[in-house]
From Swiss-Prot:
The keyword RNA-binding does not apply. It holds the Pfam family RasGEF. Residues 208-455 form the Ras-GEF domain. This is Ras-GEF domain-containing family member 1A.
Amino acid sequence: MPQTPIFPSMLGSTCSGQVQPEMGEHCGDPVYQDGSLVSGSLEVLIERLVPTLDYYPDKTYIFTFLLSARIFIHPYEILAKVGQMCIKQKQQLESGSEADKAKLKSFAAKIIQLLREWTETFPFDFQDERARKEMKEIAQRITQCDEENGTIKKSISQMTQNVLVVLSTRGQFQEVREKIRQPVSDKGTILKTKPQSAQKDILSVCSDPLILAQQLTTIELERLGNIFPEDLMQIISHMDSLDNHKCRSDVTKTYNLEAYDNWFNCLSMLVATEICKVVKKKQRTRVMEFFIDVARECFNIGNFNSMMAIISGMNLSPVARLKKTWSKVKTAKFDVLEHHMDPSSNFCNYRTALQGATQRSQSANSSREKIVIPVFNLFIKDIFFLHKIHSNRLPNGHINFKKFWEISRQIHDFLTWKQVECPYEKDKKIQTYLLTTPIYTEEALFLASFENEGPDNHMEKDSWKTLRSTLLNRA
C-alpha cells in the first residue's frame, strides 16, 4: 500500500470534506484516494504511526497524525497505545528464532527515532507528567534490547534532557511575558494637556526606515519562535465544544498566540500614538511618511505582519481624520501598500505577494531572502476556515484525514518560516523603545487628534466635548 504523500493540495474547490472511499468503507481499514491516505479509524491511524522491522512511517505522516490526533485523544494516551504495540512486537521477536532476536536492536532504534521526532516536533506534549511517564516506560522496555553497550540508553537520556531544556526555556519565556504583559494594559496615557514637542519620539530613536523595519523583523521572528504546532491547534480546540474535546485541560492554553496578537495591536497603536502626539503639522507629516517608508521596507523584507500593523495604525480613525496633515503627505507609496493589503477577493493581492515571498524563500541562498512573516491574523483565519467547512469525522466514523493533511500543510509552512535565522542584530535602544514606550488608549488618541486638528463637523464636536469631560473627570 502506498506511503502518504508530501502534503498534497488535497482540498480543491469541489471538495466538501466527504470522502468517496475506494476501500474499507465499513471497517477500520484506511481509505486511499489517488494513492493518498484520506481517512481511517483512530486505531488504524495509530498503528500506522508505530514502526516495525520492515516499516517506518513517513515524516509527513508522523507530523500530521501527531498534530491532528490531539483533537480526538490525549497525547499521553497515544503514547500508551504506541507502548503497548511496541511491547507486543518486542515479545514476538524475543520468542522467535535467533535471527529474530538479532533484529531487536534494529527495532529498538526505530522506536527511539520515532520518540525523538515526537519530542523534537511536539516537545510540549511532554509537559504532561502522564506523557513523560509513558515515554519512560517505553524507554525502559526498549533499553533491554541493547544492554551490552548502552547505546540506546544514552540516546534516551539525551532525548529526555533535550525535552527538559525546551520546557524550561518556554517556562522562562512565559515568566518574562507575564511580567511585561501587565504594563501593556497600563500604557494608555490619559491626556490632560497637549503633548510637549520636546517629548521623545520614534524619529529621535531611529530615523532610518530600513533599520526600523529590520528591528521590527527581529521582534517578529523572536515571537514566531515561541509559537509551536500545539499552539496553533488550539484554534481548533477552542471551536470544538468542551464536551467533545478530549484535551479539556489544554483548551485555554493559548498564551503564545495571545502574546503575538497583542504585539500586532500594540504596534498599530504605537504608530497611531507617534503620529497623534506630534503637535506641529510639518513634523507630523514627516512621521507619517516615515512610517509609510518603514511599511514598504517591511514588505520588501517579507515581513507582512509588521507591514499590516503599520497600515492598520495609520488607518485608525484618530489618524485617518487628520485631513490637513494627510494633504501634505506624499501618499503614492501608501496607496501601493494599501493595494497589497486590499481585503477584496479574500486578500487576493496579499496572497499573491505572500506566494512570491515563499518562492523567493525556497530558492534563497541567504537568510535575508528566506524571511517570510505572514499576516498572522489571516493565517489563523485560514486554519479556522478549513476547520469550519470540513468535518472531523466521516459518516462511517473514520477520521477525515484529508482535512488534516491540508491543515498540517499550512502549519508546516509556518514552521518553516519561523525557523529562519534572523540576519539582523538587535539594537537594544530601538527595541526597548518599540516594546516599552507608552502608547495611548483609543480615547487619548482621539483627544490628541482633535487637539491637533479641531473637529470639523457637529458629530466630531460632540465627541470631543464628551472625551474631554470624561478624561478630565477621571483624573
